[in-house]
Amino acid sequence: LGGSFNNAGGLPRNRLAAIDLNTGVLTNWHAGYPGDGEVRTIVINEDQILVGGSFLNIGNASRTRLAALDPVTGEANSWGPSANNFVFTLAVAGDGTVIAGGSFTQINATGRNRIAAIDPVSGALLPWAPSCNNAVYHIEVAGETLYVGGAFTSISANTRNRLAALSLDANTPVETWNPNANNEVYQIDVADGLVYVAGAFTLIGPTTQITRSRLACLDGITGEPTSWDPTANGLAICVEVQDDKAFVGGTYTQVGGRPRNRIAAVNTLTGKPTVFNPNVNSTVYALEYKSNILYAGGQFTSAGGATRNRLAAIDVNTGSLL
């Protein structure tokens, strides 16, 4: 897990830590990061842990906002591209190419506006160079397509309001996919050919914008919103789809008109919130599902009426805290 913390489980851990999912106990893995920046994104790529953020040192080495760490020792390896501003998101394409998104305008001192492709072995910048006019917050890989969300309104001189589909074969966005959100998109998840998006938007649609309050489900080919319409009354910051449920985190206190404080599960067919209601007391920034357990990270200090400082594990079947 990554963030801006300097302590985990009562032990010193600067911005990165590893926790045993079976026991909930902090492991000995330590990335040796003394800096004041943040870790904003983590991706496992074969035998290395890729991280991005605002840091300038990590894994006992100088690394400028991008690094690859050894999963055993926490040491930085030789992979060390540099970004001149925040890296918010990392993804690995099917051919192994590392895709970075953020607010940067240079990678390895070469112009790349908010999105870039990087060689996974050498760290060299690759020729692919779409140009986004504002920040990229999330990149989701689905087959040969990269779905991109953020604050941008154009990519390579093509109008794309906060959402776009890209291919590594071209610098311009896919022409037929243009959902046209009226405000920022923070996260994307793809399931069964559908693209679930979470953000600050209230209108979305490629031809005629329709009301979708912070959550929407889009056709993966046309970009048209489906009938799925959960309606959150505050920001939806993250979305994680599993089977027939979309788990959503953010700042909201209602979903579908029902009380749901910052975490909810929404039926992917009906768009209605399920009975799952962990009730956390502050913002949720990240959700991860594994083996019927939902892991949540954020600013909260309680969940389900119990003390949980910034991390919680919740049984998705019972709603009980672990």
Pin down the residues of each PLM region.
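Extracytoplasmic surface signature
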Residues: 1-322
